C-alpha cells in the first residue's frame, strides 16, 4: 500500500508504466515512484497549492492495464474491461470510505478524483516500517509495554471504524505501520466492507493464514 512509503523515492523502484518525475496531476507534481503493487502505484509528490510533500496512490492493475496516451490507462484486453472497472470502483470506494474517518491511526485521505481512465488518492507521506518488518529485526520478543502501546492505537482506530459500521477484515502485522514519528497507523482497507451496504450480499473471502477470523473460513 501507499502508506508504506519513506520520505524519499525508494532506490531501485521503477516500472515501465510509472508516471515520470515532473508529471503534473492537478496541483500535484510527481517527484518519484515509491512502490508498485498488484493494483496500484505509489508516488512521492509535491502539493504546489499547500506547499507540502504527499503520497499519491494511482489505481493501476498492472496485469490488466498499461499506459497508452500520456497519463491515461488502457485495458490490455477487452475481456478484462469489466474486471478493470470493478477494481476502479473498489479503489474509489476505499477512498470515499477512508475520507469519512478522522483518527491518528487511520490513513487520512486528503483528496481523491477520477481522471485518465484511472483514479488517484492523495494521502500523508508516512515514514517508517511495518510491524512485521520491525518484528523481523528483533532478536527477542518485544516488551509487553511496547506491544500494549501499539495495540492501543490499533484498537482506537478499529473503534472508529466499527462505530462507522465498517469492518477491516485484514488485521495483521504487515498492515500495522510504525511511523518514525507519530502513532502506529492501520493500513489496507482494500478488504474493508461497509456493513450496512453489505447486508444480504456475499462477502468476498479475504483470508490471511494465522490472522483471519475463524468465521471467515466458512464463508
Predicted regions and their residues:
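AlphaC helix of the protein kinase catalytic domain
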Residues: 131-142
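AlphaC helix of the eukaryotic protein kinase fold
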Residues: 68-100
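Activation-segment/catalytic-loop signature of the eukaryotic protein kinase fold
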Residues: 112
Amino acid at each position: 500500500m501507499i502508506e508504506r512509503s519513506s520520505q524519499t523515492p525508494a532506490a531501485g523502484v521503477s516500472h515501465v508504466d510509472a508516471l515520470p518525475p515532473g508529471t503534473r496531476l492537478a496541483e500535484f507534481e510527481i517527484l518519484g515512484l515509491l512502490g508498485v503493487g498488484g493494483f496500484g502505484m505509489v508516488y512521492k509528490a509535491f502539493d504546489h497549492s499547500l506547499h507540502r510533500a504527499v503520497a499519491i496512490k494511482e489505481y493501476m492493475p498492472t496485469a490488466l492495464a498499461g499506459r497508452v496516451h500520456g497519463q491515461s490507462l488502457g485495458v490490455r484486453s477487452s475481456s478484462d474491461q469489466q474486471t478493470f472497472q470493478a477494481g476502479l470502483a473498489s479503489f474509489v470506494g476505499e477512498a470515499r470510505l477512508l475520507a469519512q474517518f478522522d483518527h491518528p491511526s487511520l490513513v487520512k485521505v486528503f483528496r481523491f478524483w477520477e481522471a485518465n481512465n484511472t483514479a488517484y488518492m492523495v494521502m500523508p507521506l508516512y515514514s517508517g516500517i511495518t510491524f512485521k518488518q520491525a518484528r523481523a529485526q528483533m532478536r527477542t520478543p518485544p516488551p509487553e509495554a511496547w506491544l500494549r502501546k501499539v495495540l492501543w492505537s490499533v484498537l482506537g482506530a478499529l473503534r472508529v471504524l466499527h462505530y462507522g459500521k465498517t469492518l477491516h477484515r485484514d488485521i495483521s502485522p504487515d498492515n500495522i505501520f510504525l511511523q518514525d514519528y507519530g502513532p502506529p497507523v492501520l493500513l489496507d482497507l482494500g478488504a474493508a466492507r461497509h456493513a450496512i451496504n453489505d447486508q444480504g450480499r456475499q462477502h468476498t473471502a479475504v483470508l490471511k493464514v494465522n490472522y483471519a477470523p475463524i468465521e471467515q473460513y466458512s464463508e
